[in-house]
Design a protein with these regions (language model features):
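N-terminal helix-turn-helix DNA-binding module of bacterial transcription factors
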Residues: 1-48, 318
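Short helix-capping segments at alpha-helix termini
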Residues: 75-76, 185-195, 220-223, 245-251
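Alpha-helical recognition/docking segments in bacterial nutrient-uptake
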Residues: 49-52, 57-152, 156, 223
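Short acidic capping loops at alpha-helix termini that bridge into adjacent secondary structure
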Residues: 160-161, 194-199, 226, 250-255
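Short beta-strand segments enriched in small/hydrophobic residues
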Residues: 3-8, 43-56, 153, 161-168
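Flexible loop/turn connectors
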Residues: 215-318
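Hinge/beta->alpha junction and helix N-cap segments in small-molecule ligand-binding domains
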Residues: 37, 55-64, 82-91, 113-114, ...
Length: 318
């Protein structure tokens, strides 16, 4: 077996067959071999480290994403540096440049909601997650199809007065999810003589955003929705809190669907029905793209389908 084949196995290259991997790994275990990380870094001009820049450390979805990126990176023999831009475009650019100067092999970036481009003066390899930025490969869930699926599920239960808590208007994922909701609901609301715009409230993706939007949608005056599609699980949990405070039974009087599939959505009572993003697949794909070595342009993008997790917050309307 050639030195090159052994090197590819040690460095986690995907081109080696499973049979050869097994033989090399058995010999490595028998000899107690440990690769010289310093020598590898010197040869490659990098330090087998990846960077990750996210916009908000408080968002549970991003925490989950970081965990899965780190797991995949470790499987490939890499460590990870994490940083948060706090939704600041200037900070985002500074962090990417700083990570590049640290000789990371690439950076996974979840851009801030206001970002329309990514500054990359150091020329580091970039993969964008969860948003779409022109000229860069992106890895994301199919937000629009996931929202359509959520709205169609509520319609299948018999709901017609379905409201939507959208996200910030400048957020790519908010626009995509709202578009998916409107694909299903715009004609149905119009048929019912309801103005679609009056059944949509934009709010931050967090718990408080969901609470404040729910207060508007569940106000005492005018017709009320029998169901609410919240464009994030955090918003959906905020709706549950308002319903609890107002003694609105869920799902008896109001059905609620979220989006993301964060852990806490399966822990609250009642457990939230939600459109689940395949975060492990997204993280794995983004990490492998960075490490893979192929050209990184928009053609390398990947979109993953969402799946509905049917739990305890939905029922047919009374």
């Amino acid at each position: 077996m050639s030195v090159g084949t052994v090197s590819r196995v040690v460095n986690g290259h995907p081109s080696v067959t499973e049979a050869k991997k097994r033989i090399v790994n058995e010999v490595i275990a028998e000899l107690g071999f440990q690769p010289d990380v310093a020598a590898q870094s010197l040869r490659r001009g990098t330090n087998r480290t990846l960077g990750v820049v996210i916009p908000d450390l408080r968002n549970p979805f991003f925490a989950d994403l970081m965990q899965h990126i780190e797991l995949r990176a470790k499987e490939r023999g890499y460590s990870v540096l994490f940083a948060s831009s706090d939704e600041q475009v200037d900070s985002e650019a500074d962090l990417i440049a700083s990570l590049a100067r640290s000789k990371v092999e690439g950076v996974v970036v979840v851009p801030s909601n206001r970002a329309s481009s990514l500054a990359n003066p150091e020329g580091v390899r970039l993969v964008v997650v969860d948003r779409r930025i022109a000229g860069h490969p992106f890895v994301a869930a199919d937000h629009r199809a996931g929202a359509r699926m959520a709205a169609e599920y509520l319609v299948s239960l018999g709901h017609r007065r379905i409201a939507c808590i959208s996200g910030p208007e400048n957020a790519f994922v908010a626009r995509e999810r709202l578009a998916g909701f409107m694909d299903v609901m715009a004609p149905r609301l119009a048929e019912a003589g309801l103005d679609p715009a009056s059944w949509i409230v934009s709010a931050p993706f967090n718990y408080e955003g969901g609470r404040e939007a729910a207060k508007v949608l569940l106000a005492d005056d005018g017709p009320k929705p029998t169901a609410i599609f919240a464009c994030s699980d955090q918003q959906a949990i905020g709706v549950l809190r308002v319903a609890f405070d107002r003694r609105i039974a869920i799902p008896g009087e109001l059905s609620v669907v979220g989006f993301d599939g964060i852990l806490v959505s399966d822990l609250v009572v009642p457990r939230v029905t939600t459109a689940v993003q395949p975060v492990a697949s997204i993280a794995r794909c983004a990490t492998d793209l960075l490490i893979g070595g192929e050209a990184l342009d928009a053609s390398a993008s990947h979109i993953f389908p969402c799946a509905m997790a049917l739990r305890e917050t939905c029922a047919p309307p009374r």
